[in-house]
Amino acid sequence: MLVAGRYRLISAIGRGGMGEVWRATDEVLGRAVAVKLLLGEHADESATARFRLEAQTAARLSHPHLVAVFDFGAWENRLFLVMELVEGRSLADLLLAQERLGPEQAARIAGQAAAGLAAAHRQGIVHRDIKPGNLMLDGEGTVKIGDFGIAQFVDDPSAALTTTGHIVGTSLYLAPERALGRTADAASDMYSLGCVVYQLLLGDPPFRSDTATATLYQHVDTPPVPLRQRGVDVSAAFDTYLLGLLAKQPEDRPTAQQVADWFQGDAWRGRPEPLPPHHPAPALAPFPAAPAAPAPLPGA
């Protein structure tokens, strides 16, 4: 099947609530791409607006840790989005296969994901649905954040595309302020990332209950249990910093750039800062000898 006279669909990759994603070939440039098609039965006004928003959002972003978007348009009464093809798997797939990760791998993923979010936040874009399924790892293990379908431009409240009081996002990773129906901001993304990193290390997110509503109450009211108390072998520094990401108040969480810098350094290892190199102080010059007392005058 040839979309828009250019993109030849090869095989289906996945299907979500709004559309289906295909592996395809761009026959003009001769490269592999991913093509997302809006499903016809879901092409109502709201879904169409969200699909357009994803394209507009991605067009404002260019960063190694964000899935790039190359093209957008309409074809046979369906909208399509052409994206970078990430040859790899999502963190959700990785967790299914591996259950939990070690601190070093989790720190690398956290640092790269935070760097991608920092780029989005600098453009005034909040993702609003950070979860393992939206964090991809390419063949080299590099993080790529995808699916900006419910993103929000913080300078354009009309871009929320949700009815009043309707919460969008995934309950396991939803920030407390979002659970209370407040507007998402950059700090909300950081809380969600904290939930993901917690799950990478433990195998379970910090909060999980029998119902989505009960889980939301936990995000609002229940302090997260430190990982070290749950038997996870991480440094005290890592554990404490992660609890900061999971702070109940948005203003108490670090920014995306701060998180990226922290995890891309060695602070998460919990090692003491090295002392500055020792340079012996130069020897003090000897004091000059006191001048001899003058000889007494004759007859004095």
Label every PLM stretch briefly.
Residues 72:
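Activation-segment/catalytic-loop signature of the eukaryotic protein kinase fold
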Residues 43-46, 139-183:
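Activation segment of protein kinases
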Residues 109-110:
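Activation segment signature within eukaryotic-like protein kinase domains
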Residues 9-16, 21:
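Protein kinase glycine-rich loop
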Residues 76-90, 94, 98:
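Conserved short submotifs of the Hanks-type protein kinase catalytic core
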Residues 113-125:
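Protein kinase catalytic-loop region centered on the HRD/HxD motif
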Residues 37-60:
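AlphaC helix of the eukaryotic protein kinase fold
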